């Protein structure tokens, strides 16, 4: 038993925590998720600590690497997120570049045709250079968007001035 679990069980947790689980073993992620849920179903916990879903790395193969992914990687990813949607799980996906986010959104749109994802609060994390078209697709799906302060720290050099202009304002004080 970890110390944070004891703090929660003893009623001493002072902040609300919703946590996600990620696949730890390349190629065995789906088995891991199924085993997790067999032990700890969606909604585990209470108002202070509860299991929320899967992410930020759903599969190693789809974890925000550049370029196009093989179809087999996309098929495996689809099966996992479809399974998650069918169980009402939140999904958070780490994704860095707008240049190939079409792959991810295409899969999520496919899942959404069978299981609406809007009420599940799915999120793309770290998509620091989302284009207006990408943001519209995300809005249409009801997908959330989280960014890092990477754009505040040399964003124009990391991406380009146009990407930096699309970022929401960062409040620093």
Identify what each model region corresponds to.
Residues 26-31, 125-132:
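Active-site glycine- and acidic-residue-rich loops that bind
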Residues 111-116:
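Alpha-helix termini
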Residues 94, 121-122, 126:
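Histidine-centered active-site/metal-ligand motif
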Residues 1-3:
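Short, small-residue-biased leader/transition segments that mark boundaries at the very start
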Residues 47-48, 118-121:
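Short acidic capping loops at alpha-helix termini that bridge into adjacent secondary structure
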């Amino acid at each position: 038993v970890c110390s944070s679990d004891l703090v929660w069980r003893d009623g001493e947790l002072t902040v609300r925590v919703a946590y996600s689980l990620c696949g730890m073993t390349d190629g065995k992620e789906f088995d891991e998720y199924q085993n997790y849920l067999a032990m700890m179903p969606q909604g585990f916990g209470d108002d202070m600590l509860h299991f929320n879903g899967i992410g930020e790395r759903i599969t190693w193969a789809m974890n925000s690497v550049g370029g196009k992914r093989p179809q087999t990687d996309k098929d495996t990813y689809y099966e996992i997120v479809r399974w998650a949607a069918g169980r009402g799980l939140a999904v958070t996906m780490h994704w860095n570049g707008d240049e190939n986010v079409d792959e991810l959104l295409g899969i999520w749109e496919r899942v959404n045709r069978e299981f609406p994802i809007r009420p599940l609060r799915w999120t793309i994390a770290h998509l620091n250079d989302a284009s207006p078209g990408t943001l519209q697709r995300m809005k249409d799906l009801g997908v959330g968007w989280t960014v890092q302060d990477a754009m505040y720290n040399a964003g124009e050099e990391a991406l380009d001035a146009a990407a930096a202009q699309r970022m929401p304002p960062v409040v620093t004080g």
